[in-house]
A protein has these predicted regions:
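N-terminal binding-site loop/beta-alpha segment at the start of enzyme catalytic domains
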Residues: 1-75, 138
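A general structural detector for well-ordered alpha-helical segments in enzyme core domains, enriched
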Residues: 2, 32-36, 59-66, 95-99, ...
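Conserved, mostly hydrophobic/aromatic
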Residues: 16, 33, 40, 48, ...
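Conserved residues at the C-terminal ends of beta-strands
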Residues: 17, 51-54, 111-114, 148, ...
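Glycine/proline-rich, positively charged
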Residues: 24, 84-199, 210-216, 223-224, ...
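Structured C-terminal cap/extension of enzyme domains
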Residues: 45-46, 65, 184-372
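Short catalytic-loop micro-motif centered on adjacent basic/acidic residues
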Residues: 47-54, 143-147, 169-170, 244-246, ...
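Short beta->alpha linker loops
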Residues: 54, 58, 150-151, 250, ...
Length: 372
């Protein structure tokens, strides 16, 4: 494992994201999830990331169970404040205390104001979030604090300029260099000596499968053959100015592959030719992808029962595969009660989407696309 610095701490460059844990029947597969976290820590990962909302509020409890037997002492723990639930100043400590209880710890190493955007940042300012975090550091309930971000670049700059932050967490991958905070935001934060955590390095798995045929052909021309995961993660690891790269792994096979990549790809690991190849890859994806959904599921649950991430995933695959009959047939594999055509345009989902997608409009377009 290669290690980097985050808020003065020595951290593994690959972090374990407890957002997409293995499941059975819609619930966390506890045994397999714990086995994976133990293997991750035994293999050198020392940063485990969770949040109040992950897995419908059960991720923190699972991490607590995984940290028994000495594993807590071997790893940093990160979780996040559910800012969207805050209605008064005191709510911040109420939720923090609940999270300390969930995680069965006295102190959280890295605490983030979760998924900041213009609305939740206004909540933070109204209810004195920064003052709260500073007080919690003094109380010993948290060690370091920062924020995670999902909004437009100007909002990111406003938040960065508001405080002397230790670190921030941004979405970044070779398709998102100009999205949200983007590369310019990353560089701006570093100019302020703010350390960087990367999320969505595989764009919710969309950079792994299904691969457009044009991308497969392009990669065959590379001098060194890499898997889709290594192209995506390796490109991130080649950056010097980052700390932890989070990956939400759902299987032991994914974990083993990511560990191997993290152990052999560090700063400047890509040649200039490989970097140029990634630039071309981005161009090809931009030509094929229909919508920028990362499958984060922040839009869920839908009041009308629509499985929004699954619908958008099928829609993107339709375009990646050139609207083939096989891709078009995937629509039939979505259960009728959760298909896009059940959307009532209530709009509840829109404010929760980190990608700022006009979800009802896009679902309507999707229905027309598959009908055509």
């Amino acid at each position: 494992m290669i290690y980097r610095t985050l808020a003065g701490e020595k951290v593994s460059q690959l972090g374990f994201g407890a957002m997409r844990l293995p499941q059975i029947g819609g619930q966390i597969d506890e045994k397999e999830s714990i086995r994976m976290i133990h293997h991750a820590i035994d293999s050198g990962i020392n940063y485990v990331d969770t949040a109040w909302v992950y897995h419908n509020g059960t991720s923190e409890d699972l991490v607590a169970k995984a940290f028994k037997g000495g594993y807590r002492e071997k790893s940093f723990i990160a979780t996040k404040s559910p800012v969207w639930l805050i209605q008064k100043d005191e709510d911040f400590e109420y939720y923090l205390d609940k999270q300390l209880e969930n995680l069965q710890v006295d102190c959280i190493d890295f605490y983030l104001l979760h998924a900041l955007n213009s609305g939740t940042w206004a909540t933070c300012k109204k209810h004195n979030a920064i003052d709260f975090c500073e007080k919690m550091v003094k109380k010993g309930k948290i060690k370091h604090f920062g924020f995670s971000f999902h909004d437009a670049h100007p909002v990111f700059i406003d938040i960065v300029d508001a405080y002397n932050w230790e670190f921030c967490q941004i979405q970044y991958n070779y398709l998102d260099r100009k999205e949200q905070a983007g590369l310019d935001g990353l560089n701006y934060a570093r100019s302020k000596n703010i350390d960087i955590i990367i999320m969505e390095p595989l764009r919710g798995g969309n950079l792994v499968e299904p691969l457009p045929e044009t991308v497969k052909e392009l990669w065959k021309s590379a001098g060194k053959q890499r898997s889709a995961v290594e192209w995506a993660l390796g490109w991130i690891f080649s950056h010097k100015d980052i700390g932890v790269v989070l990956s939400g792994m759902s299987t032991m096979e994914q974990l083993v592959e990511n560990l191997a990549i993290a152990g052999s790809n560090g700063p400047d690991c890509f040649t200039s030719e490989e970097l140029a190849l990634i630039d071309k890859t981005e161009e090809l994806y931009r030509q094929n992808t229909r919508i920028g959904c990362t499958q984060c599921a922040y839009c869920m649950p839908c009041p009308s029962g629509v499985d929004i991430p699954r619908n958008f995933k099928v829609w993107n695959e339709l375009y990646m595969f050139g609207k083939s009959e096989t891709a078009r047939g995937a629509w039939q594999w979505i259960d009728a009660p959760v298909r896009a055509d059940k959307c009532t345009r209530c709009g509840v989902c829109v404010s929760h989407c980190p990608q700022q997608i006009a979800i009802p409009d896009e679902l309507e377009m999707m229905v027309k696309d598959f009908a055509g």
